[in-house]
């Protein structure tokens, strides 16, 4: 006979009332790690529950104190493991919500978002093909051999790579052809020299046989001044390097006999202007049998100067070299440049360095001073003593250069001149004096000054306004380079062309990247400039 149903039985067998559907919490299926943590937690609680049954209050307190830290540590470790996995899968919760910057992370912790922010920080953009991630610093990934790294950082004090260096070096080291669009003064010379030297690091030095087969690397530049500047910068590294490395330049102004003597012992890196290089090739002074790296520096200027045919001829002469790697640097990417790139570069990585960094940080000052002696007085009193060397003063005529040189020497300023009447040897000597700090001021005409690449120019002076507006832009561009701030002082007289003045004032207005550009009241009045658009100069 069945026993009567008790009240307790009824209570225990009652099916719990269901919650309304909208109150039921959606079930989520735990990941294996979560199940493991859950089981461990459950096991811990059950074990402790069993242990507590027959303990008095004092024993229970002691058991709690002895077990709780271990349980919490176990749970903390499990939680940390789960969080780390989720962070890796979802580009890091901490990054997205707490804003941990890429510079605070190790390389392997970098997410896609971090690389995007790094590129934005340094104004680097890319398109087409595969592009390697930019360098975060010189030391990471050990891309640069230790001996070269010590020269770059300790001896030459290049503390951080520039934007173009960050993007060029990883791509070139991975044997990609490369196109870099960057302004002059962005540090691109080191950007292509360093990968060349890294490649040479793993190649035996030239011997009595291979030295006759031509250079291992060829750099083409539009002007002799730029070619010599590249040679000078390369030699500043190689003279400190244990590996023998000969850098030779071939430019106009040097006889074929002199060039032949320089090439007698062979050269690892040859820097040349297109026309003079073809002269040497036609005269069989050298061959291009073993060029494994070809650099076109300032390719847009080479096209502008009419070197397109010469350029394509040289490219064709090295086309048969199967392992040739080509780098092209240009400030603009015109259809002509694109045609050359499509014809001679193989699936290149394409990087543009632009944005705020490429905008020249130049404070422009325009003054109307018709009297030459008054210009000199303002220059000597208000400007030259207040700016660090090097300083460049542009003039239009040789006689003005000689007159100004004498006046500055009387005022105890150290200066040198650069103009068309000087020989190539004299020009090189003047530039050497400036670069080595033996003089502070260079007085130059446009013809002589074209293509000169002098770093860290603090002040450019247009003592006489140039005959073309393009020359003015070129002059002013000698300062405010590679992220540094510079000043350009322009003197006007009553003889200036009004259409050129309209261009000048418009240029000064639109290129006020420092917010400090000024035009004097006298200049505005003389050339009928809208006074509401410009601030008067205060000196």
UniProtKB/Swiss-Prot annotation:
Biological processes annotated in GO: mRNA processing; RNA splicing
Domain called Helicase ATP-binding: residue spans: 169-351
Entry binding sites for ATP: 182-189
Span of domain Helicase C-terminal: 361-525
InterPro entries referenced in this protein's UniProt entry, alphabetically: DEAD/DEAH_box_helicase_dom (IPR011545), Helicase_ATP-bd (IPR014001), Helicase_C-like (IPR001650), P-loop_NTPase (IPR027417), RNA-helicase_DEAD-box_CS (IPR000629)
Gene Ontology terms for molecular function: ATP binding; ATP hydrolysis activity; nucleic acid binding; RNA helicase activity
Reactions catalysed: ATP + H2O = ADP + phosphate + H(+)
Keywords recorded for this protein, A-Z: ATP-binding, Cytoplasm, Helicase, Hydrolase, mRNA processing, mRNA splicing, Nucleotide-binding, Nucleus
Residues spanned by motif Q motif: 136-166
EC number: 3.6.4.13
PANTHER family linked: ATP-DEPENDENT RNA HELICASE DBP3
Subunit structure: Component of the U5 snRNP complex.
Name this polypeptide is given: Pre-mRNA-splicing ATP-dependent RNA helicase PRP28
Organism of this sequence: Kluyveromyces lactis (strain ATCC 8585 / CBS 2359 / DSM 70799 / NBRC 1267 / NRRL Y-1140 / WM37)
Higher taxonomy: Eukaryota, Fungi, Dikarya, Ascomycota, Saccharomycotina
The gene coding this protein: PRP28
């Amino acid at each position: 006979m069945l026993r009567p149903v008790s009240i307790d039985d009824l209570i225990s067998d009652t099916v719990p009332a269901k919650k309304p559907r909208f109150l039921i919490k959606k079930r989520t299926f735990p990941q294996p790690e979560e199940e493991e943590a859950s089981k461990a937690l459950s096991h811990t609680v059950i074990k402790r529950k069993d242990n507590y049954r027959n303990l008095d209050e004092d024993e229970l307190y002691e058991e709690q104190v002895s077990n709780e830290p271990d349980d919490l540590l176990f749970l903390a470790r499990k939680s940390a493991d789960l969080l780390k996995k989720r962070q890796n899968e979802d580009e890091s919760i901490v990054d997205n919500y707490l804003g941990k910057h890429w510079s605070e992370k190790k390389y392997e912790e970098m997410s896609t978002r971090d690389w995007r922010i790094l590129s934005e920080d340094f104004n680097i953009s890319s398109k087409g093909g595969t592009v390697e991630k930019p360098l975060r610093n010189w030391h990471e990934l050990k891309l640069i051999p230790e001996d070269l790294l010590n020269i770059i950082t300790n001896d030459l004090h290049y503390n951080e790579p520039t934007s173009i260096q960050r993007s060029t070096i990883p791509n070139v080291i991975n044997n990609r052809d490369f196109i870099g669009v960057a302004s002059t003064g962005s540090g691109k010379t080191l950007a292509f020299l360093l990968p060349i030297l890294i490649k040479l690091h793993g190649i035996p030095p030239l011997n009595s046989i291979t030295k006759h087969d031509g250079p291992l690397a060829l750099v083409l530049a539009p002007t002799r001044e730029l070619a010599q500047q590249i040679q000078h910068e390369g030699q500043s590294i190689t003279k400190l390097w244990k590996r023998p490395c000969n850098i030779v330049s071939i430019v106009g102004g040097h006889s074929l006999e002199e060039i032949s003597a320089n090439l007698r012992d062979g050269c690892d890196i040859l820097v040349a202007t297109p026309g003079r290089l073809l002269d040497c090739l036609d005269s069989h002074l050298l061959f291009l049998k073993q060029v494994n790296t070809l650099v076109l520096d300032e390719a847009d200027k080479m096209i502008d100067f009419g070197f397109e045919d010469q350029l394509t001829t040289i490219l064709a002469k090295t086309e048969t070299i199967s392992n040739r790697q080509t780098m092209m640097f240009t400030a603009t990417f015109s259809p002509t440049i694109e045609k050359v790139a499509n014809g001679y570069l193989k699936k290149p990585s394409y990087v543009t360095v632009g944005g705020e960094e490429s905008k020249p940080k130049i404070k422009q000052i325009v003054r109307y001073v018709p009297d030459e002696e008054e210009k000199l007085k303002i220059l000597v009193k208000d400007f030259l003593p207040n700016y660090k060397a090097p300083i460049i003063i542009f003039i239009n005529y040789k006689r003005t250069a000689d007159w100004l040189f004498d006046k500055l020497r009387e005022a105890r300023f150290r200066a040198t001149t650069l103009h068309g009447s000087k020989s190539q040897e004299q020009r090189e000597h003047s530039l050497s004096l400036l670069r080595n700090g033996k003089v502070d001021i260079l007085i130059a005409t446009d013809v002589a000054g074209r293509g000169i690449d002098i770093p860290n120019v603090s002040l450019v002076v247009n003592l006489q306004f140039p005959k073309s507006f393009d020359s003015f832009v070129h002059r002013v561009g000698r300062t405010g380079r590679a992220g540094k701030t510079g000043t350009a002082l322009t003197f006007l007289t009553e003889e200036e062309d009004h259409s050129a003045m309209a261009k000048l004032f418009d240029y000064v207005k639109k290129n006020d990247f420092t917010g400090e550009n000024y035009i004097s009241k006298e200049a505005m009045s003389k050339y009928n400039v809208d006074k509401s658009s410009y601030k008067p100069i205060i000196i």
